């Protein structure tokens, strides 16, 4: 009986899919490469590039933000796709 109950609990956990989250790189161009899990429901990663007095700046993270003109934005929907 205990084995049956344990089996049902395991099957329930597997079937519920305990919440997959997207993983994206999340560093600025001057920082070491890191990635993180995005908040639940956030299914996109972005790579944002622009130029200023320091040169080309690259920012990466979760989501797909609105940007001003002159900023190159690439959004994607797979893990670590924004490198």
UniProtKB/Swiss-Prot annotation:
InterPro entries the record matches: Snake_3FTx, Snake_toxin-like_sf, Snake_toxin_con_site, Toxin_cobra-type
Keyword terms of this UniProt record: Acetylcholine receptor inhibiting toxin, Disulfide bond, Ion channel impairing toxin, Neurotoxin, Postsynaptic neurotoxin, Secreted, Signal, Toxin
Compartment(s): Secreted
Protein's UniProt keywords contain Signal: yes
GO cellular component terms, semicolon-separated: extracellular region
One matching Pfam family: Toxin_cobra-type
Disulfide bond positions: 24-45, 38-62, 64-75, 76-81
Gene Ontology molecular function: acetylcholine receptor inhibitor activity; ion channel regulator activity; toxin activity
Tissue: Expressed by the venom gland.
Domain of life of the source: Eukaryota
PROSITE patterns in the record: SNAKE_TOXIN
Signal peptide: 1-21
The family this protein is said to belong to: Belongs to the three-finger toxin family. Short-chain subfamily. Type I alpha-neurotoxin sub-subfamily.
Entry function: Binds to muscle nicotinic acetylcholine receptor (nAChR) and inhibit acetylcholine from binding to the receptor, thereby impairing neuromuscular transmission.
Name of this protein: Short neurotoxin VAN-29
Annotated source species: Laticauda laticaudata (Blue-ringed sea krait)
């Amino acid at each position: 009986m205990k084995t049956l109950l344990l089996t049902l609990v395991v099957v329930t956990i597997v079937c519920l899919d305990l919440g997959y989250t997207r993983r994206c790189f999340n560093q600025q161009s001057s920082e070491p490469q890191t990635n993180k899990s995005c908040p639940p429901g956030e299914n996109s990663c972005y790579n944002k590039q622009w130029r200023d007095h320091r040169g080309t700046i690259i920012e990466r993270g979760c989501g797909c933000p609105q940007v001003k003109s002159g900023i190159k934005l690439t959004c994607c929907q797979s893990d670590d796709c924004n490198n």
